Amino acid sequence: MANVESFDLDHTKVRAPYVRLAGVKTTPRGDSISKYDLRLLQPNQGAIDPAAIHTLEHLLAGYLRDHLQDVVDVSPMGCRTGMYMAVIGTPDEEGVLKAFEAALQDTAAHDRPIPGVSELECGNFRDHDLHAARQHAREALAQGLKVQQTVLLQR
């Protein structure tokens, strides 16, 4: 099986909430695509409810694009402790941190209908929790986001 970057991360050494550059790939044409780990909860000490992380996905997909150029995708982690974000290019981690903070502030203040929540727009449109999503955003902001360096497992 191919190596998976997140399986080499020592999840006991990172301290959420944080932004971490998880990797950079170069396309055959020479473009860079950067993947960021946008962690909200400490690994193995909790998980975001599926309805809340689904709502965070919808909100952060838009709000991160409002604050950072060239966002390709924002997707929830399977462990439900945060999101992955793919971006064209190699924005610096401090810039990504500022964009993530701004997007979380927007999420915490969101008081309108959740975007993309209809049977036509979403594959599970009934599974959302705006209140819980806003609470996770507020909690991460209250704890203070930081840039986290990658800590590899010692094997």
From Swiss-Prot:
Catalytic activity as recorded in UniProt: S-(5-deoxy-D-ribos-5-yl)-L-homocysteine = (S)-4,5-dihydroxypentane-2,3-dione + L-homocysteine
UniProt keyword terms in alphabetical order: Autoinducer synthesis, Iron, Lyase, Metal-binding, Quorum sensing
Molecular functions per Gene Ontology: iron ion binding; S-ribosylhomocysteine lyase activity
InterPro entries: LuxS_sf (IPR037005), Metalloenz_LuxS/M16 (IPR011249), S-ribosylhomocysteinase (IPR003815)
Record EC number: 4.4.1.21
Listed cofactors: Fe cation
Ligand binding (Fe cation): H54, H58, C122
Matches recorded under Pfam families: LuxS
Subunit comment: Homodimer.
Family to which this protein belongs: Belongs to the LuxS family.
Protein name: S-ribosylhomocysteine lyase
Lineage summary: Bacteria, Thermotogati, Deinococcota, Deinococci, Deinococcales
Gene name linked to the record: luxS
